[in-house]
A protein has these predicted regions:
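Helicase motor core with emphasis on the C-terminal RecA-like subdomain
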Residues: 1-10, 14-18, 22-44, 50-54, ...
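Accessory DNA-binding and partner-docking regions appended to nucleic-acid-acting proteins
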Residues: 1-3, 353-451, 456-589
């Protein structure tokens, strides 16, 4: 079979990218394959081309409807729409039934399915009537608890592939370290797979890390986006509120509309934002990590992270959305020490008492009917667990992994599934091991991302080493990373003299009018708009300057207080609890 001709005839490409030919040859021959290629390197072709060339059906399991729709529409645009379809809950029942009928009739070559579909009653039985050749698990790192996006729905996929009699299994991911890749192989039961890990070097992307002070961060982001050829851009924020605030501030600073995108927006609004960005009607998106998967925009010139992501894998997947057209692009990561403290806080919060899996298993067993089926109120379980929805989802994953339950797709406020076995000593031991494994993995990811942030050596080489890509780093001259060229870190904009003067006036106002007099820490708390008992008891919230610097970090206010003391515009009394006072020449002014 002439794969190069097929590549040209079906996709219009003249030649394969590194690793693609080997993966396609193995898949066509019916060999298991593990493909690890970053976003934009063409990993989807490694299963699309073999699937289109074979005379049986290739099932592609993908975690997001947007991802599936994007690939189906792209193939349809190449004139292949009659051979490709998807089944999902957003389509009506008659459409899904028609797709399944076409699959049984042998009309389809690629069928896209969400992982939770295999838990739906009767779906696997209907799929048994179809001749399945290749079973593709896209975003395969989701099967590994060591991966950055672990999903319990992926547990059942190895069994589903075997039940369908698939000739070969293809695991595809953009972000898997060697450790995660081995775990993926084990959990999916890959047999002597061809391993392809390549393409992690993105020579057209210049990587940089900056360490701005809190008050410098947002002006620095605006400055980075004002440069020539800086747009379109994606700015990742750590929270929904942060995304909204950034969108507002950047709209004002840049003189063009920046749009917020996060999971708190309704589906229609998210779709509008996504369409406008894809059409270049809006060139700046301020988003949480809910944005990106399934968004195929080739001309993104800049990706900025306003805070440090939880793992190097997550960071590189998001940064890799820049420059997919091969043109010059930049990935800028802004890091503060408070990001590190937040990471530690969240990891510690994820640590789960070892009694909780048993508590949840008891509730499920009590609700199960004679056939083991259960329906529980998710909100009541969250309250009982003393955590949030993430804790509940994590525990359900541990119980699934231990073989106690099999979850079923359901509304967010319901926990639905089937009880498979008792929570006995064996299950308890498996859950303890799983819990320990998960926390160790999170600490490992913490160390890896902060090693990347704090290192002085080449960042591109560190990324390749992390993902097991042995290629020699290549880049455009002067555009590798800030370790190789310090000029790649944008200079913080000069401080706004008016803002500094306003802050100075506010600090001096507090020192002049607060009674009882306050120290530097309480001064910063007053200006930041704090609501502590001490502030309210002494009516500091009634001072003219109260809350006047709420947009600034307390640490930056404290730093300016210290500068005023050093310059002689403020003084502190002695004693164990020093307070601020004005020197005579300032008090008389």
């Amino acid at each position: 079979m002439d794969l190069t001709r097929a590549l040209h005839d079906l996709f219009g490409f003249g030649d394969f990218r590194p690793g693609q030919r080997e993966a396609c040859e193995a898949a066509v021959a019916g060999r298991d394959v593990l493909v690890v290629m970053p976003t934009g390197s063409g990993k989807s072709l490694c299963y699309q081309l073999p699937g289109l060339l074979r005379d049986d059906l290739t099932v592609v399991v993908s975690p997001l409807v947007a991802l599936m729709q994007d690939q189906v529409e792209a193939l349809a645009a190449r004139g292949l729409g009659d051979r490709v379809a998807l089944v999902n809950a957003q389509q009506d029942g008659s459409t899904n039934a028609d797709v399944m009928a076409r699959a049984r009739a042998g009309e389809l070559r690629l069928l896209y399915v969400a992982p939770e579909r295999f838990a739906a009653p009767g779906f696997l039985e209907r799929m048994r009537k179809v001749r399945v050749g290749l079973f593709v698990v896209d975003e395969a790192h989701c099967v590994s608890q060591w991966g950055h996006d672990f999903r319990p729905d992926y547990f059942r996929l190895a069994d589903a592939a075997r039940a369908l009699g698939a000739q070969a299994l293809i695991a595809s991911t953009a972000t898997a370290t060697a450790r995660v890749a081995l775990d993926v192989e084990r959990r999916l039961g890959l047999s002597d797979p061809l391993r392809v890990a390549t393409g992690f070097d993105r020579p057209n992307i210049a990587f940089a890390v900056a360490r701005p002070g809190g008050h410098e961060k947002r002006p620095l982001i605006a400055e980075a986006l004002r440069g020539p050829d800086a747009l379109p851009a994606i700015v990742y924020a750590g929270t929904r509120a942060g995304a909204e605030e950034l969108a507002g501030e950047l709209s004002a600073a840049l003189g063009e509309e920046a749009l917020a995108y996060h999971a708190g927006l309704d589906r229609e609004r998210r779709a509008v934002v996504q369409r406008r960005f894809l059409a270049d009607d809006a060139r700046v998106i301020c988003a949480t990590n809910a944005f990106g998967m399934g968004v195929d925009k080739a001309n993104v010139r800049t990706v900025i992270h306003a805070s440090v992501p939880a793992s190097l894998e997550a960071y590189y997947q998001e940064a890799g959305r820049a420059g997919r057209d091969g043109g010059p692009a930049r990935a800028l990561l802004l890091a503060e020490n408070r990001d590190k403290a937040l990471h530690v806080h969240f990891i510690k919060r994820e640590q789960i008492d070892e009694d909780l899996p048993g508590w949840l298993a008891d509730r499920i067993a009590a609700a199960a009917d004679g056939e083991g089926r259960y329906v529980l109120d998710a909100r009541e379980l969250v309250r009982g667990l003393g955590g949030d929805g993430d804790r509940l989802r994590s525990l359900l994953g541990h119980l699934t992994r231990a073989g106690v339950i099999s979850p079923t797709p359901s509304a967010p406020d319901r926990v639905v599934g089937r009880l498979l076995g008792a929570f006995d000593r064996r299950a308890a031991a498996l859950c303890r091991s799983s819990l320990d494994e998960g926390i160790k993995s999170r600490w490992r990811q913490y160390r890896e991302i902060w090693a990347y942030v704090e290192q002085d050596s080449c960042r591109r080489a560190a990324i390749l080493q992390h993902f097991g890509d042995h290629a020699t780093p290549a880049s455009r001259p002067g555009a590798c990373c800030d370790s190789c060229d310090a000029g790649l870190v944008p200079a913080p904009p000069p401080p706004d003299p008016a803002a500094i003067e306003n802050l100075d006036d506010a600090i001096i106002s507090v020192a002049r009018s607060a009674r009882p007099s306050v120290g530097r820490t309480t001064c910063a708390e007053i200006l930041h708009g704090g609501r502590s008992k001490k502030l309210l008891r002494n009516s500091y919230d009634g001072l003219p300057a109260y809350g006047g610097c709420s947009q600034m970090r307390r640490a930056d206010i404290l730093a300016r207080v210290d500068e005023l003391i050093d310059s002689g515009r403020l003084e502190t009394t002695g004693g164990p609890y020093p307070v601020l006072r004005l020197p005579a020449h300032v008090a008389a002014a």
